[in-house]
């Protein structure tokens, strides 16, 4: 593991621990809702940083955003027409965020009342905006959005705003843009860390046969070899966990030269996928 990957791995763990500290403080430690809160807040952070990274590379609007002191503050100045125009230029694999969806925009409103409602509404709005590209399809062909309201898991409504602020404070303190060019699989790292933690706490054996990221990379190299001429490949894993092996295969083959399909019976794994 190179130094930059090691740093981002450590930052990922630090972020998880920060979020777990918040959920523990509000009585949600080692619960199913804690797992959902951590993964969804991390995904929101991922969406925010990924969108910013790609928007600043856009040929039309990239220079304007990248030269600004803060890209998200400049993005707040975009008209609705400019936002839609930017969306049309971004690759289909990039999550879309409107100016009011960015982490900085939302965080700057955290001092206002009813912040928990604002956080939940933002997550649901992002899920709806990206439903065609980022969602889970069940075996019954139902579509499950990737985000849902999170602050409802705190039973006391009077504590929800502070809970939301604490969650936002955790994710606002990190920036993962520097690692996107390296194809780092964030979610396999989260999965490995959380599952080990939950199994230790509860004595369970959930996902005891998951494939560690390092092993998945070796398996992908063995399966693909040095073949640089692969085109239009299809990869399917019916028990994918978080998709670590599929991600490794896609990176080895080339993301633009393959299509991956994943499935898992576990609800936790499906959320990760």
Question: Across the structure, where does each feature detected by a protein language model lie?
Answer:
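Conserved S-adenosyl-L-methionine
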Residues: 205-273
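Non-catalytic, mostly N-terminal accessory regions of nucleic-acid modification and defense proteins
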Residues: 1-227
């Amino acid at each position: 593991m190179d130094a930059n990957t090691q740093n981002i791995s450590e930052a990922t763990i630090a972020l998880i621990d920060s979020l777990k500290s918040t959920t523990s403080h509000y009585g949600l430690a080692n619960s199913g809702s804690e797992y959902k809160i951590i993964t969804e807040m991390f995904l929101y952070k991922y969406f925010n940083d990924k969108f910013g990274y790609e928007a600043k590379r856009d040929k039309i609007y990239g220079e304007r955003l990248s030269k600004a002191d803060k890209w998200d503050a400049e993005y707040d100045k975009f008209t609705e027409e400019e936002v839609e125009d930017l969306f049309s230029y971004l690759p289909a694999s990039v999550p879309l965020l409107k100016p009011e969806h960015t982490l900085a925009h939302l965080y700057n409103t955290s001092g206002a009342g009813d912040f928990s409602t604002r956080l939940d509404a933002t997550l649901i709005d992002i899920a709806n905006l990206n439903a065609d590209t980022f969602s889970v399809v069940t075996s019954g062909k139902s579509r499950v959005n990737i985000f849902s309201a999170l602050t409802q898991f705190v039973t006391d409504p009077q504590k929800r705003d502070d809970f939301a602020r604490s969650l936002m404070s955790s994710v606002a303190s990190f920036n993962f843009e520097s690692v996107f060019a390296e194809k780092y699989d964030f979610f396999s790292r989260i999965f490995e860390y959380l599952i080990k933690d939950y199994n230790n706490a509860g004595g369970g054996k959930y996902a005891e046969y998951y494939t560690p990221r390092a092993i998945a990379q070796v398996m992908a190299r063995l399966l693909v070899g040095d073949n640089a001429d692969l085109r239009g490949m299809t990869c399917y894993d019916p028990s994918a966990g978080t998709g670590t092996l599929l991600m490794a295969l896609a990176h080895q083959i080339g993301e633009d030269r393959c299509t991956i399909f994943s499935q898992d019976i576990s609800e936790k794994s499906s959320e990760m996928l």
